[in-house]
Amino acid sequence: MNDQLTEVYASIDALIDYALAHLDLDPRNADWTRNQIFALFRLDSYPGPKTTTSAASVSDVVQDIVGSRSQAPYGEKTPDPLLAAFRAAATTAGLFKPEEGPAYADTIMGILSANPADLDDRFLLVEHRDGGMAAMQWFYDYCVSNNYVKRAQLDRNPRFDSHGLTVTINLAKPEFKNMKKAAAGNAVAGGYPKCTICHENEGFAGRDKRTLRTLPVTLGGESWFWQFSPYGYFDQHGICVNTDHTPMHVDRDTFGHLLDFVDRFPGYFLGCNAALPRIGGSVLAHDHYQGGGELLPMHKAATWAAFTLADYPDAVVEILDWPGTAVRVVSKSRQSIIDVTDIIREAWVGYDDAANGIASHDADGNRQSALSPSAIITERGYEMSLIFRNNAISDEYQIGRASCRERV
């Protein structure tokens, strides 16, 4: 066996050791898992881990990972250095071309990762023992460790916090600005999966989703699932997706869904974009919410006025000191939060004010107004923040305009 293959075997051994330490790989499955990786490249001359001549170099790689812990938040829990060592060894040995490295790395990490059912079982054990937030932290750490969440890239994103606002520049995440693509949900060529966030993407090689793992979540008695974003905008950014491929919408049920989620995971927020082009998300064909473990600036924004509705004395509506038109509904009562929020939604989506250029529908009767809600739990109870959105365009505002507080 030549030295080049020796380096390949040593790098694979290092990845197996990493999976044993960080991906809950059962030692009884180590040989079986190693052989799956060997099969990718038709490797059949493995000398065994104790007889490789590259033990020192592999040890150095592992030490480099441990040593980087002070510089990177997740340190040794990220496999990037080991994957880099494998890719370098494999390309030198002629197993694949350099440009094929990312796909093979994704394949190997998918092999090393636990299957979805086992992962869900472990999540439920942690949740039963330590609570929903501890279970989410465990799941997030796992998704970092199996390289689905790209911590190495996220840690390089610029971030600016000042005057109650946060600006992040996501250098890695692809964005879709084309409205037709948004309406189609960024449909995939071939029709499978139906869109980029369908549950069928879990483990799908066609979009390099071999390491994607999801968790089932019940919202409003319906089947949804949670997954973390590989290129999140904030801490523990994830999406909660309807298991059925159904279009985005915001209605009364939406508010109950958001509260169901924060009841189970009270340290997270959950919200959604307005379900309209230009002011909505990049995937409108599939109903989904976004949330995570970091309160957004709007959740902490001060208020400049507050009032109550006569029929709901246990709920307070606060007008936020915010660049856009936004209010916050606060109550310890789930029912009051849902009722008051839906009253506001119905009023806004039908609101017209020609003097201020606000039209709820365009000339063809298409709806133009919508809400972007997000829910959190605080010591005050439930808090539902609502951003008033309108996607109207004109010759003067060809890409639309924000509905500003001063004009409403």
Give, region by region, the residue ranges found by the protein language model.
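Helical scaffold of the NTase/Pol beta-like nucleotidyltransferase catalytic core
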Residues: 211-213, 243-270
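Histidine-centered divalent-metal-coordination microenvironment in nucleic-acid enzymes
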Residues: 236-237, 242, 280-296, 385-387
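Catalytic or ion-translocation cores adjacent to nucleophile or general acid/base/metal-coordination motifs
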Residues: 253, 262-282, 291-352
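Active-site microenvironments that recognize anionic phosphate/pyrophosphate groups
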Residues: 1-247, 323, 338, 347-407
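Beta-rich nucleic-acid/ligand-interaction surfaces
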Residues: 277-285, 363-370
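Short C-terminal domain-edge/linker segments immediately following a structured domain
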Residues: 196-201, 259, 270-272, 301-304, ...
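Charged catalytic cores and adjacent phosphate/nucleic-acid-binding surfaces used
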Residues: 5-6, 27, 289-292, 298
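Hydrophobic faces of well-ordered beta-strands that scaffold small-molecule active sites
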Residues: 226, 270, 287-289
